[in-house]
A protein has these predicted regions:
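Cys-nucleophile CN-hydrolase/nitrilase-fold catalytic domain and related Cys-dependent amidase chemistry
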Residues: 106-198, 267-282, 286
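CN hydrolase (nitrilase-like) catalytic-core segments centered on the catalytic cysteine
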Residues: 155-177, 245-337
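Active-site catalytic loop in hydrolytic enzyme cores
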Residues: 167, 183-260, 269-282, 358
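C-terminal beta-strand edge segments of enzyme domains
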Residues: 297-389
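Short hydrophobic alpha-helix segments
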Residues: 53, 199, 205-206, 327-333
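Terminal substrate-recognition subdomain of acyl/acetyltransferases
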Residues: 2-89
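Short hydrophobic/aromatic beta-strand or adjacent loop that forms the aromatic wall/cage
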Residues: 64-70, 190, 224-226, 308-311, ...
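Short beta-strand segments enriched in small/hydrophobic residues
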Residues: 86-100
Length: 389
């Protein structure tokens, strides 16, 4: 059953008819300033008053002839779907805690990537998340160059890496969040996360907020698009490392229907990691979504700006009775190369949105404040570009 539509009496309205209109009476019942034996019961069971009908029952003197037209929506209703188009409730996520080590060639790096993709796909995972700038070991060949030139040399690998990742997503039937890679667009350098659909489609998102180190060492620029990605199992968002520390971005994605937020990160110290971790946990609570984070571990002593790494991958949840008491669904051992795999139940988010102990999204005071994305400013001489490839 999808919904119930009903007409209802307001039997105590006759006691207030000389003081207020039917609509004012109904608002008083909603605020619990007035108790109506019929309407109070209906409202407490999530019936919503859509309109007031006059002369619905003229002989109902207690209701003064008025009646409410109410609607009750069944949040558990699922329309019949063919097996080809149905979406499952449980989604399996794999996070790679990636050990940085020297690689002489791109092929050597991709051999390690394929190992993890193969391992995660063996568990029939829907997603695999790699860390931010996981491919920086390839910069070792450019140690003789200034950092700002070395990172641009690294960006030259990106087109080939994108092609290789896309083939893996198709071959192993798993959606891949390819961490992030440097990308050159219109001669500007961006920190870009690619999403490789297992059907062959590719989406990408630029990092919005560039850290002082990225700007000073590498002259990176921030992107200007924030949008969810529709996948075969749900709606996801990607925020790269520092971006998760800005709650506005998570809220914009939540308003677009995001169910899972993926955060590839790169942090050098435990302090930096905790900033990402604590903010990721907050995004899960305030946006009523799951959050998966994954970072690099180990050391790259001969590569400028990449010498230290600290990480602890995790899958985080909202905080309510349906979820783990500490909001942690799965967690890696700190600073150890490994994979974590966890199932998340998207149907629990629907339950939380409607019946949670608190309802952060629903209870916002939109009469007082709002968070919205401004239109992207188009660069002179360029056309607006889509997120997809």
């Amino acid at each position: 059953m999808k919904a119930i539509i009903a007409g209802g009496r307001i039997p105590r309205y006759h006691q207030y008819a000389d003081k207020m209109s039917p609509k004012e009476y109904i608002e008083g019942v909603k605020r619990r300033e007035i108790h109506d034996p019929t309407l109070s019961f209906q409202i407490s069971n999530d019936f919503q008053v859509k309109l007031v009908s006059k002369n619905y029952l003229p002989e109902d003197n207690e209701s003064m002839g008025y009646a409410t037209i109410l609607v009750w929506h069944n949040i558990y209703y699922e329309p019949d779907q063919s097996l080809l188009h149905s979406r499952k409730s449980y989604v399996r996520i794999g996070c790679v805690q990636w050990q940085v080590r020297p690689y002489a060639k791109m092929e050597d790096l991709m051999e390690s990537v394929e190992y993890f993709v193969d391992a995660v796909s063996d568990y029939e995972s829907d997603f695999i998340l790699f860390p931010e700038l996981f491919n920086t070991p390839l910069m070792g060949s450019f140690n003789h160059l200034p950092a700002v030139q070395a990172i641009r040399e690294l960006a030259k690998f990106t087109p080939d890496l994108v092609e290789a990742f896309s083939k893996l997503a198709i071959s192993y039937n798993v959606n891949i969040i390819g961490g992030s890679m440097p990308m050159i667009e219109d001669d500007e350098l961006y920190n870009t996360s690619y999403f490789f659909h297992r059907n062959g489609k590719i989406d990408f998102s630029h990092k919005i907020h560039i850290t002082p180190s990225e700007e000073y060492e590498w002259a990176m620029k921030g992107g200007d698009k924030v949008s969810i990605i529709e996948t075969d199992v749900g709606k996801i968002g990607i925020l790269i490392c520092y971006d998760v520390e800005f709650p506005e971005l998570g809220r914009i994605l939540a308003d677009q229907g995001m169910q899972i937020l993926f955060v590839p990160f790169l942090t050098d110290t435990q302090n930096a990691y905790n900033r990402v971790r604590f903010c990721a946990q907050a995004r899960a609570v305030e946006n009523e979504c799951f959050v998966a984070i994954a970072g690099n571990v180990g050391n790259l002593p001969k590569i400028a700006n990449m010498d230290l790494q600290f990480a602890q991958a995790a899958v985080l949840t909202p905080s309510d009775f349906q979820f783990p008491v500490n909001g942690i669904k799965a967690e890696a051992t700190p600073n150890t190369e490994m994979i974590i795999i966890s199932d998340v139940d998207l149907s629990l988010l629907v339950e939380l949105h409607n019946y949670g102990s608190v309802q952060n999204l629903k209870d916002r005071r939109k009469d007082l404040y709002e968070v919205k994305l401004k239109p992207a400013v188009k660069k002179p001489g360029t056309e607006a570009q889509n997120n997809g490839i």
